[in-house]
Structure formats: structure tokens, C-alpha cells
Design a protein with these regions (language model features):
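Conserved donor NDP-sugar-binding/catalytic core segment of glycosyltransferases
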Residues: 100-132
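Conserved nucleotide-sugar donor-binding catalytic segment
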Residues: 72, 120, 140-229
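A conserved acidic beta->alpha catalytic loop
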Residues: 24, 31, 39-48, 69, ...
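Cell-envelope/extracellular polymer assembly enzymes that use nucleotide-activated donors
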Residues: 3-6, 24, 34, 184
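Short aromatic/hydrophobic "clamp" motif used to bind/position activated sugar donors
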Residues: 88
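Glycine-rich, basic loop-to-helix element that forms the pyrophosphate-binding segment
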Residues: 65-83, 104
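C-terminal subregions of glycosyltransferases and related glycan-biosynthesis enzymes
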Residues: 184, 191, 198-344
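A conserved hydrophobic helix/loop-capping motif in glycosyltransferases and polysaccharide synthases
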Residues: 5-17, 21, 28, 38
């Protein structure tokens, strides 16, 4: 019997975009799929539109979220619990997949039954596919864990096909987090040795929309979201030590610095200071790096960064912690790669 792909889609107030997503699913050359849309309390016509599609094609089903807490990852996990697929794929209601997406992904996975998941190339767009002409990201010489530390991820939620059993075994999405859910998920996969390959020899099959309604600066640096980042970093440190990779703790310095500098810029100096003390005790930053970070904290605390010389000094002290990620920055004229590589 052909393998069934379960497409799990959280929805919330996407009446203007959800039809495009549904149409792209209906256009698949691989007919063996089901789509479970779990609605998170939409107040517009999103549910009505999905229900109209479901009435025309029984492979599409819509549910109201019943799990807690509210949020997209809760909807995704609840969908996984209800689905029947051999594979699971996550698709948001503002993204679009190419007609060959499922067929290429299934055939890639079935060529190697030992894989837990596979990563596929995707493109960024704003209004219509190809309008930005940018890769989501490209292959580089560094291993995936190194790139994850540097905030230069090659994998994100919609660009991956998971074997359902593997996704359940890894623990699914972490519902305690408000941000960095994708980052935390793939840290778990890489550190714990899940088997994967990148099939960047295949054509891009996903169009990932640049969201104009992204978090404002105030929302992005809200205390609860900063604590979510802290939780991810601490969990990564725990996993590294538990999996015999404590020697990689210093690579956390990029994440540590990003969290601390973000907290400092938003006035959360107590959080920044306590997290710096934790990072130094764990070996995530060296004595010299801690001193450099502490200098930046002092400049923010004194509000001297309002003035040019102090602001430039703070920027210079932060520069060594930049991860130089290229997500959404590489034009499609740059080759993405021409090989399938990973952790076989």
C-alpha cells in the first residue's frame, strides 16, 4: 500500500491566504495524503473556507483545538495525535507547496528506510511565489549542529518530512515554548543522533511566506519570550552533557549573547545578568567573553548607548558573537548544492 502523508496545519485568522495553501495541497501529484487543519479559535472566515474545501475533498478535515495551551505547536501536536499517516509534514496557512512536493519527499524517504527525517530546499516569497528570488537557506561546509548554534539553520518546520514514529519518539513540539520552537526541535534531533539527509539536489518544493505581520519589537523582546529563549539554551546545554557532547558547550556563546543583548536592549537587565552568570558557570562563555558581554551590559544599564562613542563600543563588543546566518538572504542565482548529505 502506498505511504500516506499527513499534512498538519494550524490555523488562526487566515481567511485571506488559506485558500492558496489548500489549492497547493490539492494539486499534489502524490494522491496519498490527508490534511488535518486544527483551528486555534479563528474569528474570521478561516474555518468556513477550510470546511468548504473539506466538503469537496474528504482528505481534508478540520478540527477545533482542544489541547492546551493555545498556540500553533499545540495544534500541530494535536493533529499528529489524530493522524493516520506514515509520514508527517507541517504546513502553515500562509505557505505554498509545489505540485511535486509530496511525491519527491516520499520517494526520497523511501529510498532510505532508516531515515528519521529529510530536509528539502525552499524559497522565500512575499506575495507570489518567486517574487523575492531568495532561498530559505543553502548548504554550507559546517555541520548542521554548528549552524544551529550560529542561528543559521538549514531546517525549519515546513521544509522537512518526518517519519511519524520518529517524530513521536523525539517528543513532538515543545509546548512550553513561545519562541524558537523550530530551533529547539532540531537541536534535539541533531544532538540525539536522529538520522536525516538533505536532498538539495531536488528542486525547491516549498514557498515560505515572509510574514508582514511578524512580531513587533516590543512583542519579540517581551519577558515571557525572552524566558522561552533562555529555556531553549539551558535545555541544549543539558542535552549536550547527557549525550557526551559537553565539549560543544562553548558553541552556545552565540545564542547566549543574542539572548543577553536582546534582554539588555529591552531593559531586562536582571534576566541578562543572571543568564550571563549561568552561561559562565556552564562553560558556554569563557572568562574573556563574559567580560566582553558584561561591558556591553554596563553600557546599556548606564544608558550610555544613547551616545555615539558608547554605542559604537557596544556594537564592537557584540560583533564577535554574530553568527553570520544567511536565512532568507541568499539569491536563487547562488547554487543551493547538488548532493544529498546528512547524518546517515
Amino acid at each position: 500500500m502506498p505511504s500516506l502523508v499527513s499534512i498538519l496545519t494550524p490555523s488562526f485568522n487566515r481567511e485571506d491566504l488559506v485558500a492558496e495553501t489548500l489549492d497547493s495541497v490539492l494539486a499534489q501529484t502524490w494522491p496519498h495524503w490527508e490534511m488535518l487543519v486544527v483551528d486555534d479559535g479563528s474569528t474570521d472566515r478561516t474555518k468556513e473556507i477550510v470546511a468548504e474545501y473539506a466538503a469537496r475533498d474528504s482528505r481534508i478535515r478540520i478540527f477545533d483545538r482542544t489541547w492546551q495551551p493555545k498556540g500553533a505547536c499545540t495544534c500541530r501536536n494535536e493533529g499528529v495525535a489524530m493522524c493516520d499517516g506514515d509520514y508527517v509534514m507541517f504546513l502553515d496557512t500562509d505557505d505554498i507547496i509545489e505540485p511535486f512536493c509530496l511525491e519527491n519527499r516520499v520517494r526520497a524517504m523511501e529510498a532510505d528506510p532508516e531515515l528519521d527525517f529529510a530536509i528539502f530546499p525552499g524559497l522565500m516569497f512575499e506575495h507570489t511565489p518567486h517574487d523575492l528570488g531568495l532561498w530559505w537557506n543553502i548548504e554550507k561546509p559546517e555541520d548542521e549542529l554548528t549552524r544551529q548554534f550560529r542561528q543559521d539553520a538549514i531546517a525549519q518546520g515546513t521544509g522537512v518530512l518526518w517519519r511519524k514514529e520518529s517524530f513521536v519518539r523525539i517528543g513532538m513540539w515543545n509546548l512550553e515554548l513561545m519562541l524558537w520552537q523550530d530551533i529547539e526541535l532540531f537541536f534535539r534531533a541533531y544532538i540525539q543522533g536522529y538520522r536525516y539527509r538533505k536532498f538539495f539536489d531536488l528542486p525547491p518544493d516549498l514557498h515560505n511566506r515572509v510574514n508582514p505581520a511578524s512580531l513587533s519589537r516590543a512583542q519579540f523582546f517581551a519577558p515571557e519570550k525572552q524566558w522561552s529563549r533562555v529555556r531553549v539554551a539551558k535545555h541544549v546545554a543539558t542535552m549536550l552533557k547527557a549525550n557526551g557532547q559537553a565539549d560543544r558547550l562553548p558553541e552556545l556563546r552565540f545564542m547566549v549573547a543574542e539572548i543577553i543583548f536582546g534582554a539588555a536592549r529591552s531593559g531586562q537587565l536582571r534576566l541578562a545578568t543572571s543568564f550571563l552568570l549561568w552561561a559562565r558557570a556552564e562553560g558556554a562563555v569563557s572568562t574573556g567573553e563574559a567580560a566582553r558581554i558584561a561591558l556591553v551590559l554596563g553600557l546599556y544599564a548606564s544608558r550610555l548607548t544613547r551616545f555615539g562613542p558608547a554605542r559604537r563600543l557596544a556594537e564592537a563588543q557584540q560583533r564577535p558573537f554574530w553568527g553570520h546566518g544567511t536565512i532568507g538572504q541568499i539569491p536563487i542565482s547562488t547554487p543551493v548544492t547538488s548532493k544529498a548529505v546528512g547524518n546517515p
